[in-house]
């Protein structure tokens, strides 16, 4: 009882707090030759700068200088700076919302430009994502001063990632982003799809490919609404999307076995890149299916019912006839 009372009091105090504006500052590896628009995503305003805005300079440099040189390097002057702004009751809630908004945008970009297959020849693996954030994220107030002594640092950050140039992208990533955001806005379960996109981009930030396999399989379960189901159901619903179902069933069964080995043994074999990119392709296919939502499903669960249908036209026509007979019977009853 005392514990519950304490939780209720803490919640009451949190809700009573006045909201205030927070700014999160980080870097992103977009080539400075690109002109990026302002994005408003889920109540967060995202702005891009080719140079570090003066009001943040003192606080940002102070944080970097306080850390050991081996931990945090100076900002990359050839990368864009990005600020996110949101009104929230706490630093943690603000940072969480802003990073979610940034990663949703990055997820859409990477869904469009990530490569279908890349092989590395020895050495350290690099993230599959093309668009990545810098290692350091700092929180600021309206004057640019530190809003908190807390900062966010990615110890796995890959330093040598090349810069992305949307200007040479023949497929027009900015236009793709507009279209995806319009579709998500119209989608009845768009917020669920956004969660999947954020999970997708965070999974592919990692250089630990065994961890990537585990995370991608979890996203596959999420997108097929099989988190509480067995593996067979996950595979069955995924292969419904493909004409060559038997082949894809075998591939997914192999990936499932590899995923299980990764959980227990951290296999990291020579073929791990192939497995990562195969699994990534299934996740991306399902993401695009849910983003478009051509059949106007109301939820992930309803889309899962669609994927449970028999992939057989004759059987489906019989099912339709039975449903019509049932409606006729109920009408007469």
Regions found by a protein language model. Name each.
Residues 213-246:
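Flexible secondary-structure boundary motifs
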């Amino acid at each position: 009882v005392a514990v519950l009372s304490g939780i209720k009091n803490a919640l009451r105090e949190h809700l009573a707090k006045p909201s205030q504006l927070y700014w999160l500052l980080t870097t992103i590896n977009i080539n400075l030759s690109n002109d990026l628009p302002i994005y408003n995503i889920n109540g967060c305003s995202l702005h891009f700068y080719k140079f570090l805005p003066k009001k943040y300079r003192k606080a940002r440099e102070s944080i970097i200088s306080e850390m050991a040189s081996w931990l945090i390097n100076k900002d990359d002057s050839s990368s864009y700076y990005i600020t996110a702004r949101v009104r929230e009751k706490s630093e943690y809630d603000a940072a969480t919302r802003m990073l979610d908004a940034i990663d949703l945008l990055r997820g859409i970009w990477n869904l469009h430009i990530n490569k279908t297959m890349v092989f590395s020849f020895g050495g350290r693996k690099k993230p599959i994502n093309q668009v990545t954030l810098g290692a350091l994220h700092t929180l600021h107030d309206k004057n640019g001063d530190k809003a908190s002594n807390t900062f966010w640092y990615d110890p796995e950050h890959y330093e040598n990632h090349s810069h992305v140039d949307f200007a040479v992208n023949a497929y027009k990533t900015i236009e793709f982003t507009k279209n995806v955001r319009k579709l998500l806005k119209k989608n009845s379960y768009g917020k669920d799809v956004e969660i999947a996109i954020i999970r997708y981009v965070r999974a592919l930030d990692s250089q630990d490919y065994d961890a990537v396999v585990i995370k991608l399989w979890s996203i596959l379960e999420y997108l097929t609404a099989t988190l509480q189901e067995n593996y067979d159901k996950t595979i069955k619903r995924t292969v419904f999307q493909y004409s060559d179902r038997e082949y894809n069933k075998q591939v997914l069964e192999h990936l499932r076995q590899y995923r299980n080995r990764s959980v227990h043994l951290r296999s990291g074999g020579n073929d791990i890149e192939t497995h990562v990119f195969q699994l990534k392709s299934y996740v991306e296919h399902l993401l695009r299916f849910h983003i478009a939502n051509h059949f106007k499903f109301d939820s992930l669960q309803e889309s899962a019912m669609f994927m449970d249908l028999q992939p057989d036209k004759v059987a489906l026509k019989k099912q339709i006839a039975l449903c019509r007979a049932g409606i006729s019977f109920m009408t007469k009853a």
